[in-house]
From Swiss-Prot:
It comes from the Bacteria. Disulfide bonds: none annotated. This is 2-heptyl-4(1H)-quinolone synthase subunit PqsB. Belongs to the thiolase-like superfamily. FabH family. The keyword Nucleotide-binding does not apply. It is found in: Cytoplasm. InterPro entries: Thiolase-like. The keyword Cell membrane does not apply.
Length: 283
């Protein structure tokens, strides 16, 4: 998979949560809709690559938060691909959404599918608007809100690898769950609850898993998500949106290929995919 261009848009407000899995994360406020973040991020990527919406062959959306995502607060679903297609005007694009998938796994699946279909311009978007979810106050875990857009060109050459978290192999990590509110009576009701138990050493285990997985590709530089503030100089963690600045830095450094590593909090594993990069001159 060739990354042609990157776009990102984050809320200006940050919320800091205490706890072993806490940190300072961008947080959507009030009546903000995810489309307010998605559309600028996508347009940034399209402008950078000089690609028009009608030239997009496939749109793939990834989101975890079951909240009001588009222009209407009554909409509640993690699917973002079709609403984005409509607003963007990408009328000839095929569309599907992936849920409970890491970005690394999604890019690998999309590369395989899209190359088989002969698609040329593929838009992969990752977005969160989680103000309708109760955060885990005990562990301090929350989702980072915002939008990431990757304009890709399938190559059919992506390699994928999954690995365990680092630390004690006998440790059984409890995964993230998002129990939904089954008694929603009005728009402002809580949609669900983020539940990732406070587990000592989890941030270190995730980062150790990243390092170990990267060791399987010693010839490649790697970029990674950052889900936890513990161990960070400023306590700030942008989740998958952390990748935007790293991918741009790799483009500036004229790297031709790298490894992107994601954390899957539902499977409690780390996953990596190899990517090719279009340089700044190409992008």
């Amino acid at each position: 998979m060739l990354i042609q261009a990157v776009g990102v848009n984050l809320p200006p407000s940050y919320v800091c949560l205490e706890g072993p899995l806490g940190g300072e994360r961008p947080r959507a406020q009030g009546d903000e809709m995810l489309m307010q973040r998605l559309l600028p991020a996508v347009r940034e990527a399209l402008d950078e690559a000089a690609v028009k919406p009608e030239e997009i062959d496939l749109i793939v959306g990834l989101a975890l938060s079951p909240d009001h995502l588009i222009e209407n607060r009554d909409i509640m679903a993690p699917k973002i691909g079709h609403p984005l297609q409509k607003v963007l005007g990408a009328n000839r694009a095929h569309v599907f959404d992936l849920t409970d998938s890491s970005l690394a796994r999604a890019l690998y699946v999309v590369d395989t599918l899209a190359s088989d279909q002969g698609y040329r311009n593929v838009l992969v978007v990752r977005g969160e608007s989680s103000q309708g979810l109760e955060v885990d106050s005990e562990s301090g875990f929350a989702l980072a809100d915002g939008a990431l857009a990757l304009l890709c060109r399938p190559t059919g050459k992506a390699a994928f690898r999954r690995g365990a978290l680092g630390g004690d192999p006998a440790q059984e990590w409890l995964p993230l769950s998002i129990p939904l509110n089954t008694d929603i009576r009005q728009v402002g009701d809580v949609k669900g609850h983020l539940n990732l138990p406070a587990q000592p050493g989890l941030p270190e285990a995730v980062r150790a898993g990243f390092t170990r997985l990267a060791g399987d590709f010693p010839q490649l530089n790697w970029v990674r998500e950052e889900w936890f503030g513990q161990g960070r100089p400023d306590g700030r963690c942008l989740g998958p949106f952390e990748l935007a600045s790293q991918l741009r830095a790799a483009q500036r450094d004229r790297l031709d290929e790298l490894l992107l590593i994601s954390f899957d909090p539902f499977g409690m594993v780390v996953e990596g995919v190899t990517l090719e990069l279009a340089g700044e001159a190409h992008a």
